Amino acid sequence: MSAEIERKFVLDAPPQGIEEHPSEPIAQGYVALDEDVEVRVRRRAERTYLTIKAGSGRRRVEQELEIEPERFDALWPLTEGRRIVKRRYLVPVGADELTFEVDVYEDALAGLVVAECEFPDDAAADAFVSPDWLGREVTDDPRWKNQALALHGRPE
């Protein structure tokens, strides 16, 4: 399993010109949830995945496996009541060749916009100075994890 180092921000609105960036639809649901471990299935455009994530905060362990669409379809009903639908835009930021994943949520979470960026190491994550368009950082707030959003909706 590989570790990922991410920072997450909540935006007031999508960044101006976001439609000019590459994007894809995402539907994901949670098969099993625990406080620090999640098992999810995800459809990203035409590809389907099974992912296990463990940990909290900005350093998490993730294992993602591409699965056959038929397996996704078999698991999807198990996620009823624990799903999110969003459009993900890939937005480059700064001269460091960082790319933010800006998620514009749909359905029950319509209006929510969240941006995440993965960093190569803790030093890069610590050194990152966020641009003005990024909102409040919620990396360490478990209420903003996708699994929590799928279960409880947008935090107040």
Predicted regions and their residues:
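Phosphate-end processing signature that detects enzymes handling 5′-triphosphorylated RNA
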Residues: M1-E156
